Amino acid sequence: MGSSEDQAYRLLNDYANGFMVSQVLFAACELGVFDLLAEAPGPLDVAAVAAGVRASAHGTELLLDICVSLKLLKVETRGGKAFYRNTELSSDYLTTVSPTSQCSMLKYMGRTSYRCWGHLADAVREGRNQYLETFGVPAEELFTAIYRSEGERLQFMQALQEVWSVNGRSVLTAFDLSVFPLMCDLGGGAGALAKECMSLYPGCKITVFDIPEVVWTAKQHFSFQEEEQIDFQEGDFFKDPLPEADLYILARVLHDWADGKCSHLLERIYHTCKPGGGILVIESLLDEDRRGPLLTQLYSLNMLVQTEGQERTPTHYHMLLSSAGFRDFQFKKTGAIYDAILARK
């Protein structure tokens, strides 16, 4: 093969073997490799890591060396032995003690998303999510499927907490929200975004509105230091009365649903919203031609595999919001994974 053919073949193999890279990351997190190395007083050899994570020495060595190639670990040789330690990347994002840890998100992706993606061809053929085929759970009620057990619900909520620990600040500072003293985070889970709002806009008060099971889990498993300013209310935002607010936040909510349900929800928010109030939509925005960014395209395909929705362009969101009655549409690409849209009543 010529050089261009070689390059094309290597690219093909990179794509075909990409799932192996994901599984290395998932497995190392699942086994606790990065936590073990973070807690150790110094670099550890294969035997020590294998003993610490209760795994075979052979398998552990293979996993550690691949993590080195992926720049997740560093290795040094002393006396003919290899000793491993975390890189800055793994220390920041792959240890559970880090404030920017993404371990729960990666575990959720490995246990749930990855398995659903095994049915991608069926999802494309049928145009629907694959919870029934993957887990035997009917998906007529989307979040009944997503929250199919208490453990799965907690895992998903922890994953979202981690997403906003990294991405919350960029989307909440895309616009000056200090003009909205009373906020409501619809579908706000365990309140990670609400906490970030408190730190950025200490004069505001915020209500997290979510279904009863989520509110119960939030109160049981997550800690709060701003109880006097963050209020949890139970309800279904598709049918129950919405809390009064100057600003309604929808973060990673609309992408779960088809246009019809999005329109229904936005109309309910518009009718409840005070005159001059607003709505902040936080999503990963597609380019107008829908051919990028690649990560957002992949997220949109994930919406097919796991939800009823899709990722959308700014124009698509403008249409949904204006049809519900909102005006003064603005959007900002943050340069991070998630972007922000603000509209007013």
UniProtKB/Swiss-Prot annotation:
Keywords: Lipid metabolism, Melatonin biosynthesis, Methyltransferase, S-adenosyl-L-methionine, Transferase
Record bears the keyword Coiled coil: no
Gene3D superfamilies: Vaccinia Virus protein VP39, Winged helix-like DNA-binding domain superfamily/Winged helix DNA-binding domain
Effect of residue 243 to L: Reduced enzyme activity
One annotated GO biological process: indolalkylamine biosynthetic process
GO terms for MF: acetylserotonin O-methyltransferase activity; identical protein binding; O-methyltransferase activity; protein homodimerization activity; S-methyltransferase activity
Binding site for S-adenosyl-L-methionine: 147, 164, 210, 235-237, 252
PROSITE patterns listed in its UniProt record: SAM_OMT_II
Gene responsible for this protein: ASMT
Expression triggers: By all-trans-, 9-cis- and 13-cis-retinoic acid and by serum treatment, following starvation, in the retinoblastoma cell line Y79.
Pfam families in the cross-refs: Dimerisation, Methyltransf_2
Protein's name in the database: Acetylserotonin O-methyltransferase
Residues given in the record as substrate binding sites: 256, 302, 306
Tissue expression from the record: Expressed in the pineal gland (at protein level). In the retina, very low expression is found at the mRNA level, and not at the protein level.
GO CC annotation terms, alphabetical: cytosol
Misc note: The gene coding for this protein is located in the pseudoautosomal region 1 (PAR1) of X and Y chromosomes.
